[in-house]
């Protein structure tokens, strides 16, 4: 498959680093574009444009790290911080707005009493994505 536009949502886990490296490999083949986004969740009591400094600083550090990882592979990644009430819908909205061909997400292996759990965001993205989704397990 050929992917010209790849969206890589990140949360700051080790799986994100592997996901960005995989995105670079996929994008290099077609000289595609990669966007890495971090979604800052805004509580309903606050306006959507509220500045939550610690969360913004965390997002900037994570996205800077993604840029460095891509540069190590001689590739450029555009980064963006999104403000939203919920992460899943923000990722889908971004994918639609940018017209991406692929959403690539790094997921941590979580076990709960012997069962595999993907949390809330990944199932939402899988169900509502306008394009293929690749999950890269750490």
Where are the model-predicted features located?
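Small/aliphatic-rich secondary-structure junction motif
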Residues: 1-50, 69-73, 78
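Structural beta-alpha unit
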Residues: 1, 71-103
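Glycine-rich, Arg-bearing micro-motifs that act as flexible, cationic patches
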Residues: 105-127
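A short acidic, glycine-rich active-site loop
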Residues: 51-61
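Short, acidic/small-residue loops that bind anionic groups at enzyme active sites
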Residues: 124, 128-137
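Active-site phosphate/pyrophosphate- and oxyanion-stabilizing loops and adjacent acidic/basic residues
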Residues: 24, 92, 123
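Short secondary-structure boundary segments
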Residues: 38, 106-108, 137-138
């Amino acid at each position: 498959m050929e992917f010209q536009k790849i969206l890589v949502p990140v949360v700051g886990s080790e799986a994100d680093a592997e996901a960005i490296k995989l995105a670079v490999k996929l994008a290099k083949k077609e000289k595609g574009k990669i966007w890495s986004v971090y979604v800052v969740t805004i509580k309903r009591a606050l306006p959507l444009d509220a500045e939550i400094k610690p969360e913004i600083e965390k997002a900037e550090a994570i996205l800077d790290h993604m840029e460095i990882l891509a540069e190590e592979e001689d590739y450029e990644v555009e980064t963006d911080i999104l403000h939203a009430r919920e992460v899943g819908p923000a990722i889908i909205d971004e994918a639609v707005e940018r017209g991406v061909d692929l959403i690539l997400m790094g997921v941590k292996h979580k076990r709960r009493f012997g069962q595999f759990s993907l949390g809330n965001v990944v199932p939402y993205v899988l169900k509502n994505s306008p394009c293929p989704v690749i999950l890269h397990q750490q």
